[in-house]
Amino acid sequence: SGRMGVEGFCVENMTTTSGTKVVYTGVPGAYAEAAMDAYFGSEIDGFNVETFGDAMEAVHSGKAEYGVLPIENSSTGSVNDVYDLLSAYDNHIVGETMIKIEHALLGLPGSRLEDIHTVYSHPQGLMQCSRFLDGHREWQQVSLQNTAASAKRVLDDGDMAQAAIASKQAARNFGLTVLKERLNDLDNNFTRFVIISHKKIFQENADKISVCFEVPHESGTLYNILGHFIFNGLSMTRIESRPIQGKPWQYRFFVDFNGNLREQAVRNALHGIQSETEGFRILGNYKGVEPLY
């Protein structure tokens, strides 16, 4: 039912088959794979790439129909690289999902906590377990691309003095032993992942919209722009700013708010914002998930 929404978006329900290609970052056992499984189930053809940029490129070029990328963590905040990629690529957010992050310390079978002197993880993994790591100041902390790659590194190196901070699923995938569970500083640590597509589609029941825009550097500008949400009775759920490369002191804003592209209030607000900003883009309209606490 290709009914038009706004800005060339049209209503189309997402259908997947066992042949639908979905890309995620990291190696099997990464939280992104868990997010993909949670959103799509097993009836797809998932594959992994190394970086967020590679995933965006795969979706843009058509190698993958959908991509799964982390956008925000409940304890350590935004995944800045992904915000930058959303503005750089002509891809769209078509869904989101939330994954509970439960970090464990993984070592080789037979290794013991007291033998460890090097620990690998993603920088966010190290940050989210800082309280635990503070108790082991003598350990060398090494940042790698993602948590699952860290687990793989421990397996490949075969060194009893090395450990990784990753999921228990990664321990199963790589045949490692869980030396200690529940390392996170916070019990309720979640990462929100967005589902990306090159197609400009939104589902009939979509209730969350993401936009980005650049604001000319004048006082009061952002205030005026945000006024469009308020006047039209729309509630913002998130606002992020990122510096714009090559434009000192200028920022690109990312705003999430509740609504559907077919609603008049939404169209009014977007029209107003577009007229007062540069580089305005609707990143997507999708079904939001409730935060898990």
Where are these regions (language model features)?
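Domain-level signature for soluble enzymes in the chorismate/prephenate branch of the shikimate pathway
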Residues: 1-293
